[in-house]
Amino acid sequence: MNFIKENSQALIQRMGIVVIKQICDDLFALNVLNGEEVAIICSHRVEQDAARDIVHMILKKGSAACNLFLKSLENWNYPVYQDLTGHSLFHQNLEEDLDVLAQSLKDLYNSPVFKNFFPLGEDIDIIFNLQITFTEPVLWRKDHRHHRVEQMTLGSLLEALKSPCLIEGESGKGKSTLLQKIAMLWASGMCPALNQFKLVFFIRLSSARGGLFETLYDQLVNIPDSISKPTFRALLLKLHKKVLFLLDAYNEFHPQNCPEIEALVKENHRFKNMVIVTTTTECLRHIRHVGALTVEVGDMTEDSARVLIREVLINELAEGLLFQMQESRCLRNLMRTPLFVVITCAIQMGSEEFQAHTQTMLFQTFYDLLIQKNRRRHSGGTSGDFVRSLDYCGDLALEGVFSHKFDFELEDVCSMNEDVLVRTGLLCKYTAQRLRPTYKFFHKSFQEYTAGRRLSSLLKSREPEEVSKGNSYLKKMVSISDITSLYGNLLLYTCGSSTEATRAIMRHLAMVCEHGSLQGLSVTKRPLWRQESIQNLRNTTEQDVLKAINVNSFVECGINLFSESISKSELSQEFEAFFQGKSLYINSENIPDYLFDFFKYLPNCVSALDFVKLDFYGRATVSQDKTGENSSGVHTEGPSTYIPSRAVSLFFNWMQKFKTLEVTLRDISKLNKQDIKYLGKIFSSASNLKLYIKRCAAVAGRLSSVLRTCKNIHSLMVEASPLTTEDEQYITSVTDLQNLSIHDLHTQRLPGGLADSLGNLKNLLKLILDDIRLNEEDAKSLAEGLRNLKKMRLLHLTRLSDMGEGMDYIVKSLSEEPCDLQEMKLVDCCLTANSLKILAQNLHNLVKLSVLDMSENYLEKAGSEALQGLIGRLGVLEQLSALMLPWCWDAYISLPNLLKQLEGTPGLVKLGLKNWRLRDEEIRSFGEFLEMNPLRDLQQLDLAGHGVSSDGWLSFMDVFENLKQLVFFDFGTEEFLPDAALVRKLGQVLSKLTLLQEARLTGWELDDYDISVIKGTFKLVTA
């Protein structure tokens, strides 16, 4: 009694309201205080008043009550008890023990047992060293709405640390190594933000048992004997924020096993120690409400992934993997998750034949790790229940892929499976700031893998019901564009999971190509007119272009499926049926290893391809072949060449022949003898060779040497590449040539060159001369040569200037005798009225013409008469599908006669009346014509250079919207201010032309409001 009375002042000042209430609870349970007394004490708002009441009450109750009071005080506030009894906790010896404990922790954090860890679990004997493999993480601070608000580094996190700090992230994001790194930084003494902490404890919550003291003793170091459990407890209270707890994996923590650690997190205000705790996003909901700072671990940067790979793998393996990362966007995306970097490195360590583009292997390893690690957490069900849960997860993923769904609601996840799927890590559960939980696979690609794994198991099942279910999914894939864009990864992982599934898939894809939708791609998704110039596309229908693009991507998809399946020659027959008649594009700068496997194991499939395209670019390389290269595909020695030996190895070492090989040489400034020799080896693999040369200064004087190596060349194109007279002469000596295109050749023609000798190419079917320097004498020579080209089906003469009246001779030579010419373009080529008269007189000799393009030609003298004469003879061209006419100053007066002739060409696809200066009267006549004779197949309409008013265009709009196949139109003019009514109407009409890809309204004075009304998914050109 005397002790309490003597120390009453200190007790009243130091006990604190929390300790007072805890002592009240103890004394009430021991019948020292009754309920009324407890209520009086606890009713005080000022803690000193409460302390004063309890001290006075205890003193009145005698010695026994005083002893019980002191015992309770010792339990709940040991430092105060020690101070009052004269036994100060922090005497010199205990300070020394504290220093010993801190040093022991630092020694632990600097030891190999702490730095070395098993990134894939202790069952897999692969060890990483944290000292050299740790990379700077990307961290995001989140606000109370759970939104990212600020990117942080580890350093800025430690400087702004608040307790408790919650670090969230999905499996494999590197949360554990982050906490270990903090412990190591503290032990090093090199981090100022951590030097404030006297003690730092790293605790794995998955194995936390008993109390906090026992857990630390079990997991970390031996605590000095002089520090008892009560002493340690008091120590934590005394040191307050000088102690940091690093609590790893709250998602694997069982609070009932260690209530004291649970209180350390959720009642941190009592302990006042600093706490950092990591957890998965799904389990964050259990502690988010107590967090003072919430941080998310973001994606790993590509640079960090590269650093980790270099530290983990030996140089040769690291360089190979880094090269594959550079070439594969998908692999780079996967490497944003540290665990995938680890898995990739681990697989690389164990397999010399590992190819990182085999993504199935990565996901399969990850999937198996999740199941292996978390299966023990499944309780309350049989093994069969667990397997059924995994099947259900696969079904969920499959349905999501086909319904384009990657976020799932509660009703999507069966209640009996939800716990299993979340606990195993296959599904992530998001609850933060959501009324109802959302479920996701941690990565879209992982959902596609899970779906592919399930589809594979269905297709190879021995149960007819499951096989039927798998086939029902395949039957949903009927569009090539959907297969390559929406379902490409699903098929990739399905083929990577089993050979039997690959067989079923390839049979289905072969049928899709034969009977399915070859188009199936909306124009809005792939703006083709923006990918290539309109001039290149005007000869091709929209459907043909889409078909070509889709089939090319389909072939790439097929090769990827072959590579992923690792079936080698086992499915040769199924793959051949798929590749039959298709084309393949190869970039010589990036020839992947799997193409060598494709040529090696499926030579019959390569031979089945109708067309193979190979491009070479003007960047010198060093020798690089399949067997002698380093893992990045590049030798460190060998002569510099423009033709990579890797391409030679692929084509020349293959013993069969391509049906058609197209080789493009682009931007090459130099060709040495070795390059030409290499080209000859590549050319020899083709039964039919097409050679395209673009912007290659190197061919001047060497083209003849290149052509001498071409034994089966049937097509040659030269663009913006200088030619000598010898080169031109050699071109005309290749008598098997069927297609010849010369573009942008501005050097003066010399005697004996191309114009003089063109007639030697008697097998020529297609001739294109574009932007070539020709004078009138050259044109006369060219005309003589054209007379001998009896087999020619296509002729383009475009952008030819300074020919004087040379076109008269050319037109006469083309038309004076019956011929099989089907397409003739005479664009911007000095066409005269006399040329037009000659053509009109001889048009009966060109009855097979389907394309007649004479645009960009101004007829000066007697132009109107010549134009009307030609129009009057158009009726003999029964197969006409494209008509682009020249112009003269009064061309519009010819419109009535033209419309009368067009009544006999309902299948017209392209019509061009550029610079005809159409007026309101003519545009109304044209509209009336379209009402009576709808050109349903019209894709291109060029009425540029008109004089139509807003009223005239308004009268035309109703019939204009019926041109449903329209892809391109040009209504450009000069200084035209459209009425608001016209703009609104035009916007409505264009919204109905769903195939439209380009609209040209140059000269229309449109403001932002007008453009907002008119614009759509097509390209709008106004200037």
UniProtKB/Swiss-Prot annotation:
Q: Which UniProt keywords apply?
A: Apoptosis, ATP-binding, Cytoplasm, Immunity, Inflammatory response, Innate immunity, Leucine-rich repeat, Nucleotide-binding, Phosphoprotein, Repeat
Which SUPFAM superfamilies does the record match to this protein? Answer: DEATH domain, P-loop containing nucleoside triphosphate hydrolases, RNI-like
List the Gene3D superfamilies hit by this protein, alphabetically.
1.10.1900.50, Death Domain, Fas, P-loop containing nucleotide triphosphate hydrolases, Ribonuclease Inhibitor
Please give the superkingdom of this protein's source. Eukaryota
Biological process GO terms, please?
activation of innate immune response; apoptotic process; defense response to bacterium; detection of bacterium; inflammatory response; innate immune response; positive regulation of apoptotic process; positive regulation of interleukin-1 beta production
- Protein modification: Phosphorylated at Ser-533 following infection of macrophages with S.typhimurium (Salmonella). Phosphorylation is essential for NLRC4 inflammasome function to promote caspase-1 activation and pyroptosis. PRKCD phosphorylates Ser-533 in vitro.
List Phosphoserine occurrences by residue. S533
> What segment(s) does the record annotate as region Nucleotide-binding domain (NBD)?
95-298
Q: Which residue intervals correspond to the LRR repeats?
A: 578-598, 655-678, 734-757, 761-784, 786-811, 823-846, 847-869, 877-901, 910-932, 935-962, 964-984, 998-1020
Keyword Glycoprotein, does the record have it? no
Winged-helix domain (WHD): where is this region?
356-463
Main localization, broad class: cytoplasm
Q: Where in the cell is it found?
A: Cytoplasm, Cytosol
Give residues annotated as binding ATP: G169, E170, S171, G172, K173, G174, K175, S176
Main function? Key component of inflammasomes that indirectly senses specific proteins from pathogenic bacteria and fungi and responds by assembling an inflammasome complex that promotes caspase-1 activation, cytokine production and macrophage pyroptosis. The NLRC4 inflammasome is activated as part of the innate immune response to a range of intracellular bacteria.
Fill in the subunit field for this protein: Homooligomer; homooligomerizes following activation of Naip proteins by pathogenic proteins such as S.typhimurium (Salmonella) flagellin or PrgJ. Component of the NLRC4 inflammasome, at least composed of NLRC4, caspase-1 (CASP1) and some NAIP family member. Interacts with EIF2AK2/PKR.
Q: What is known of its domains?
A: In an autoinhibited form the C-terminal leucine-rich repeat (LRR) domain is positioned to sterically occlude one side of the NBD domain and consequently sequester NLRC4 in a monomeric state. An ADP-mediated interaction between the NBD and the WHD also contributes to the autoinhibition.
Q: Which protein are we looking at? A: NLR family CARD domain-containing protein 4
Source organism of this protein record: Rattus norvegicus
